[in-house]
Design a protein with these regions (language model features):
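Conserved glycine-rich cofactor-binding loop
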Residues: 15-16
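Rossmann-fold cofactor-recognition segment
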Residues: 50-68
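Substrate-binding pocket helix/loop in short-chain dehydrogenase/reductase
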Residues: 97-98, 105-110
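C-terminal helical subdomain
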Residues: 174-186, 200-244
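Conserved glycine-rich Rossmann-like NAD(P)H-binding loop of the short-chain dehydrogenase/reductase
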Residues: 31-45
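Active-site loop of short-chain dehydrogenase/reductase
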Residues: 6-7, 56, 82-84, 128-141, ...
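Catalytic loop of short-chain dehydrogenase/reductase
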Residues: 135-160, 165-166, 170-173, 188
Length: 244
């Protein structure tokens, strides 16, 4: 039986892989999990799985681009038990040649990958300041560090999110809030990723070129447990075989 803490973890962008793995990892430590994605019914299986293992989780349908929706979600999470960690994990990874990048595409990707992160971070900070501390983690990507061909919309949004995280870390660190940006610098091991790589190369991906969601989640847990006198702000994660 998991010993329950009087503390909440909220994940905005609780997808099937990284977000779900983070939820499972923190549920094992007794945190109350509050999970948000556009269609919250897609989280029913994960919520049931966590409950069956003795944990506590709730699913929420949230449009992270809505200030009202994000505010209501984090208010509810903090009311259930004081927030200790908020994770922003929305990707919006799309590839469009620059001449095919419409205004709508560019704006929507920015809203999902940057603006929604700002809303999440601001509202998380509001609660964590009242709670006298905690952590806010932003999931980044290779595109957070460099703009690849066809990734003008995605990379510009991820660059922006990284800047939001840096500014928040400098402002909030002295107030006992650990703000971190995690760069996921490789493909995550999923059936879809394996299929795409094999279609492109004609061979299965090497075992040392993919990241397991559970391994990524472990890094989030270790980061959250860091002592205040040795906080990491930016952490880049990649498998041993990934060229960089």
């Amino acid at each position: 039986m998991v010993e329950q803490r009087n503390a909440s973890v909220a994940i905005v962008g609780a997808g099937d892989y990284i977000g779900s793995a983070i939820a499972r990892r923190f549920a094992r430590e007794g945190y109350q999990l509050h999970l948000a994605r556009r269609d919250g019914t897609k989280l029913d299986g994960l919520v049931a799985e966590i409950a069956a293992a003795g944990g506590t989780a709730s699913a929420h349908s949230v449009d992270a681009r809505s200030e009202e929706a994000i505010t209501a979600f984090l208010d509810a999470a903090n009311a259930a038990a004081p927030l200790e960690l908020v994770v922003f994990n929305i990707g919006a990874n799309v590839n469009f040649p620059i001449l095919e990048t419409t205004e709508r595409v560019f704006r929507k990707v920015w809203e999902m990958a940057c603006y929604a992160g700002f809303l999440t971070g601001r509202e998380a900070a509001r609660h964590l300041l009242a709670n006298k501390g905690g952590s806010i983690f932003f999931t980044g990507a290779t595109a957070s560090m460099r703009g690849g061909s066809g990734y003008a919309a995605f990379a510009s949004a991820k660059f922006g999110l990284r800047a939001v995280a840096q500014a928040m870390a400098r402002e909030l660190g002295p107030q006992n809030i650990h703000v971190a940006h995690l760069v996921i610098d490789s493909a995550v091991d999923t059936a879809w990723v394996r299929e795409r790589i094999e279609q492109r190369t004609g061979t299965p991906p090497p075992a040392d070129r993919l990241m397991e969601p559970e391994s990524i989640a472990e890094a989030y847990w270790q980061l959250h447990r860091q002592p205040r006198d040795a906080w990491t702000h930016e952490l880049d994660l990649r498998p041993a075989g990934e060229p960089w």
